[in-house]
């Protein structure tokens, strides 16, 4: 797939996508604030270091991290990178796909975020191996992707097609993939974007989104 032809300004404006057409930007503050609250406890022992957002889009997630960190972002979309730079002028951005050899040295990052990326890729396992290479031993990886269960299959089929979701993983498949690519699972859960903490608290597997916090081993 030619990702750069798919993820253009039209995709992020909602013309060629589903969730952006619903006003994704308006809900992003709540969504990314909730995500950061989950990640934040794992930053307590990382006073300084490098953070990478894989598939950073407009850079909303990087904005949540304190400036004491060196913040990096990659995305296949040149348009997205331009917008991310506006929101994060002190961060470093590169145009790159997660399935390609990532433009960073081995063992470079302390924390890597991969929010709603794997479902867009032809080979999510390759992307996780690439991420593993550039993450420091003991480094933290946060992954979020649609949970392909009965709820997702029946209620989100149109949305997934419109969003170009080509690799849909169940929650257990995501955990297995992380284990196979060299990560130790520290925590995992499923959730709904509108009821984030309900699913987080009760650890239900019926949420239509799946997430895991893992560590490089």
Give short role names for the model-derived ranges:
Residues 1-105, 111, 115, 128, ...:
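Conserved N-terminal segment of class I S-adenosyl-L-methionine
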Residues 116-120:
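A short His-aromatic
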Residues 121-125, 145, 149:
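A structural helix-start
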Residues 125-137:
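A short glycine-rich, Lys/Arg-flanked "PGG" loop and its adjoining helix->strand segment in the class I
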Residues 139-145:
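Conserved beta-strand signature within the Rossmann-like core of class I S-adenosyl-L-methionine
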Residues 146-166:
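Short, glycine-/aromatic-enriched active-site segment of Class I SAM-dependent methyltransferases
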Residues 166-181:
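Short alpha-helix
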């Amino acid at each position: 797939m030619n990702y750069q032809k798919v993820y253009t300004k039209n995709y992020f404006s909602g013309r060629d996508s589903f969730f952006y057409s619903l006003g994704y930007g308006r809900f992003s503050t709540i969504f990314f604030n909730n995500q950061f609250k989950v990640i934040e406890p794992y930053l307590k022992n990382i006073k300084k270091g490098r953070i990478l957002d894989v598939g950073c889009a407009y850079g909303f997630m990087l904005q949540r991290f304190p400036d004491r960190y060196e913040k990096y972002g990659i995305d296949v979309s040149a348009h997205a990178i331009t917008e991310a730079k506006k929101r994060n002028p002190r961060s470093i951005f590169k145009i790159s796909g997660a399935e390609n050899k990532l433009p960073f040295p081995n063992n470079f990052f302390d924390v890597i975020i991969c929010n709603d990326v794997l479902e867009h890729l032809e080979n999510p396992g390759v992307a996780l191996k690439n991420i593993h290479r550039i993450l420091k031993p003991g480094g933290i990886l946060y992954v979020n992707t649609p949970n392909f269960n009965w709820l997702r299959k029946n209620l989100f089929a149109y949305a997934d097609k419109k969003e170009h979701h080509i690799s849909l993983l169940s929650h257990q498949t995501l955990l297995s993939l992380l284990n196979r690519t060299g990560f130790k699972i520290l925590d995992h859960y499923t959730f709904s974007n509108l009821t984030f903490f309900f699913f987080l608290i009760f650890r239900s597997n019926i949420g239509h989104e799946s997430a895991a916090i893992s560590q490089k081993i």
